[in-house]
Regions:
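Arg/Lys-rich, alpha-helical DNA-contact motif
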Residues: 1-105
Length: 105
């Protein structure tokens, strides 16, 4: 049915491997005795998606910072000036991101 196909599409879209989607389908076919196994499968996938979201949010923060960085550099004509801006003069969100980026290097 359509709802079942949407669930499979959702699992695929979240990066679940085909073998695990196949496992889910087989569990559904086996009926209610596999409810616990299906729940575990979805809980595991939820955890994986939450990790992916966290990683994407961190990447997006870096991209936002670099957009600001190059927009500012374009206005002033160089990156040296932007690099010299003290952290305390940056808006808090940019300051936090800059500090995270610098702590990675």
């Amino acid at each position: 049915d359509y709802e079942f196909l949407k669930i499979i599409h959702c699992l695929k879209a979240t990066g679940m491997q085909i073998k695990d989607i196949r496992k889910f389908i087989l569990l559904v076919i086996q009926g209610d005795k596999t409810i616990d196994a299906r729940l575990k499968l979805f809980q595991n996938q939820k955890n994986e998606v939450e990790k992916q979201i966290q990683q994407l949010e961190e990447a997006l923060d870096t991209i936002k910072f670099k957009c600001w960085y190059y927009e500012t550099a374009k206005v002033v004509g160089n990156t040296e000036f932007v690099d010299s801006i003290p952290d305390e003069e940056l808006p808090e969100d940019l300051r936090v991101i800059r500090q995270k980026i610098r702590s990675l290097g």
